Amino acid sequence: MRPRVQTAAAWPRVCIESVTPSVDNGRFPVKRTVGDRICVEADAFCDGHDRIAVAVLWRPADAKTWASAPMRALGNDRWRAEFPLERIGTYEFRVEGWRDVFATLHADLEKKRAASTVLPVDVQEAVAVVQAAHARSEGALATQLQDILTRIGAQSEPLQQLAIVLEPDTAQAMALADDKPFRSEYPVTFRVESERRAAHFSSWYELFPRSQSGDGQRHGTFDDVIGRLAHIRAMNFDVLYMPPIHPIGAKNRKGRNNAVTAQDGEPGSPYAIGAADGGHTEVHAELGGLEGFRRLIQAARAHGLEVALDFAIQCAPDHPWLQEHKDWFTWRADGSIPYAENPPKKYQDIVNVDFYASGAVPDLWNTLRDAVLFWVNEGVTLFRVDNPHTKPFPFWEWLIADVRGRRPDVVFLSEAFTRPKMMYRLAKCGFSQSYTYFTWRNHKHELREYIEELNDGVPRECFRPHFFVNTPDINPLFLQTSGRNGHLIRAALATTLSGLWGMYQGFELCEATPLAPGKEEYLDSEKYQLRAWPERAPGDIVDEITRFNQLRRMHPELQSHLGTRFYQAHNDQVLYFGKFLDAGYLSRSRSMVLVAINLDPQAGQDAEVEIPLWELGLPDHASVAVEDLWDGHRFTWHGKTQHIRLEATRPFALWRIRAGEVA
């Protein structure tokens, strides 16, 4: 179909392209933290040689009016501006541009004045532009422009009049009076999720409350957990995370070490949710019931800890929903219901809901949302979601938006060990954080490639990696064979590479006994039985974990995976990288954190490393002040190349380097 001339004439003359930050061209919000400044960039240009103006407009999504800030030209038609995130919740921003008539006129007249080629008609036309601006202005701006015109009229010489036209005050007033001819706007309104600090920086400690009595034969309670809080906080953790705390099904209950049949008295898996006592909004009686949970919430707050709960959308075969809401499930022709599988794993004690069963929409969806809100009302605002990749993306996008629309302080952690694109899609759908492949990245090139992937493109804008060193389901092979040194290596990697890290109880004790050689499961897994954990043990790494968490709090560079750059260490067993907040902070502070980690748990390693003096604006022969962050020792490095040695028993080093100082 041929366009009409009138239609074509209305098409934008000012072109706006390649707006960032963006996820799928605005289909999903980018993620940031309250207090951040959003750096918006766009390509913008117009035909011919006329000047253009470009602006970013932003607001909290629930606000009626837009704030605006001019974007500055970076060169090659790229423009940039920033705006602050002053509260949590959703923000919106747009980019607009227009032909800047006065800026074009101003630039032309400056050139003519410099070349002494100004004609009287040039001044007349300039004054006419100011007069037109005055005619469409009101209030104080109209008064200011009238004063400018009066001053111009008081001058008889064109060059004297021109001098007033070219004054900075005139340019400022004309910018305010601009009627934005040929204004165009990028056709997408972009969104930003401004989340609280815990969404991007926190340290998680996971435990099973039933294993906290100190006696492997007595079921623990929330009050027993309260007795552990001081120790957990003393290790400088921020979050206490517990697996499901709901009634556990009796039907098809699993036994010790995942035995298909439980023996009398065995507690079963807490992931087999639901029994005669209730389901997702009830508390397992032996833990102390809801009142016990409320005591734990209050005690945790008093210790400066936040409690995270597991949200697992699955049911034991005797969950009340199977009787009360049969139309939420898929049944076989013989009236049975299939148990859950995640090949090669089989979960005979669990059945799954069907999100699109005949009675599921909207009842099941609303019920699950209400279960989350129930625990939010009980003081829980951190949720670790079990296997979200096996549930529909539309469900998560709806549920998270609904919950955060009511309570924007709620944070969701995705426990999805699946394909990268699925993990990133869950982040796009609203998950604040995600488990990652870190657990299986052990070699230098693997770690570097993975961190660089997370620092680029879509993952950078919406995917916050949570580096768990172990989980109740994952006893990494590396830890099984590397002892205390290996546990130190993984702790060092997790705490320095990501702002989010976590560990499951026993890691600090270097417990890594496998169910069988080559298996990632733990022997005597407390998913199926009670355990008794001491606070300390010979050869533990409690002190080191405490120090790592302390350093993370002290040094903002360690509070995000963003701003990680890898540098040259001439040894494949030494991972060496730098951390900084952003390029602007780096140029202002001329300071950064450097980290080196020996990846070999069996032997010490030496390496020649390159100190990134260029990052601080220094030549290769410069000197920098160095502080060893682990022990506080201060010294000076002279020149770009330095020799380091990392022992197997202390396989890491952290330094802060500063330009302009010598120790």
UniProtKB/Swiss-Prot annotation:
It catalyses: alpha-maltose 1-phosphate + [(1->4)-alpha-D-glucosyl](n) = [(1->4)-alpha-D-glucosyl](n+2) + phosphate. It comes from the Bacteria. Alpha-maltose 1-phosphate binds at residues 254, 314, 349, 387, 527-528. Its EC number is 2.4.99.16. Keywords: Carbohydrate metabolism, Glycosyltransferase, Transferase. GO terms for molecular function: alpha-amylase activity; hexosyltransferase activity. Disulfide bonds: none annotated. The active site is at residues 386, 415. PANTHER family: ALPHA-1,4-GLUCAN:MALTOSE-1-PHOSPHATE MALTOSYLTRANSFERASE, GLYCOSYL HYDROLASE FAMILY 13 CATALYTIC DOMAIN-CONTAINING PROTEIN. Maltosyltransferase that uses maltose 1-phosphate (M1P) as the sugar donor to elongate linear or branched alpha-(1->4)-glucans. Is involved in a branched alpha-glucan biosynthetic pathway from trehalose, together with TreS, Mak and GlgB. Homodimer. This is Alpha-1,4-glucan:maltose-1-phosphate maltosyltransferase. It comes from Xanthomonas campestris pv. campestris (strain ATCC 33913 / DSM 3586 / NCPPB 528 / LMG 568 / P 25). The gene is glgE.
